[in-house]
Amino acid sequence: MKALKIALTKGRLEKDAVALLEKAGIDCSSMTDKKRKLIFHSSTQPISFILVKAVDVMTYVKHGVADIGIVGKDVLMEASKSHYEMLDLEIGKCQFCLASTPDFDPSSYRRKIIATKYPTVASKFFREKGEDVEIIKIEGSVEIAPVLGLADAIIDIVETGSTLKENGLLIYEKMYPISARLIVNKASLKQNKTQIFQLIDQLEQAIKEERIE
């Protein structure tokens, strides 16, 4: 049986994803002592794991290097769709928010400048509101953009809001809820349908148990 390759997002989401996979009966013991390794093979199941950055999960899945990926909905919303989104894993929950300094007026008709790591999401949000805005893409700490006068406001993902608060920003609008999703390569789903749907069934059961707990 061909081993399923699962691409996991490195960092905070990785820990939650591994915990959920283990709850679903997936052997993740090879990842216990990671050191600098990025590829891991289960010794008991036909499954291997790849640890990559969030945006690269989609690339590995798109090109079939990984059969399955676990990645935040924020990344999926920003990129073009080249995969099947199969399951909301209900982990890594946060929210897209519009935030700025206390003197920001969201109802102003003046053309606003919005800083964000997510220009596609920001464009969609303001297009739906019928507002014409200028969007500046920021790769680093977007929170300082309105403080330093680069932008009128920001759009970013917010979990607790503590980073915004520490930088003197307020949330003006909560936009789209975000959580981690299971994505599958289109060709892999055809070739490994039984294996993949068995994994999905196991994860769905684990998610149900998490809700009860």
Swiss-Prot record:
Cleavable signal peptide: none
InterPro entries linked: ATP_PRibTrfase_cat, ATP_PRibTrfase_CS, ATP_PRibTrfase_HisG, ATP_PRibTrfase_HisG_short
PROSITE patterns: ATP_P_PHORIBOSYLTR (PS01316)
EC identifiers of the protein: 2.4.2.17
SUPFAM superfamilies: Periplasmic binding protein-like II
Primary location: cytoplasm
Biological pathway: Amino-acid biosynthesis; L-histidine biosynthesis; L-histidine from 5-phospho-alpha-D-ribose 1-diphosphate: step 1/9
Catalytic activity of the protein: 1-(5-phospho-beta-D-ribosyl)-ATP + diphosphate = 5-phospho-alpha-D-ribose 1-diphosphate + ATP
Biological function: Catalyzes the condensation of ATP and 5-phosphoribose 1-diphosphate to form N'-(5'-phosphoribosyl)-ATP (PR-ATP). Has a crucial role in the pathway because the rate of histidine biosynthesis seems to be controlled primarily by regulation of HisG enzymatic activity.
Subunit structure: Heteromultimer composed of HisG and HisZ subunits.
Name the UniProt record assigns to this protein: ATP phosphoribosyltransferase
Organism listed in the record: Listeria monocytogenes serotype 4a (strain HCC23)
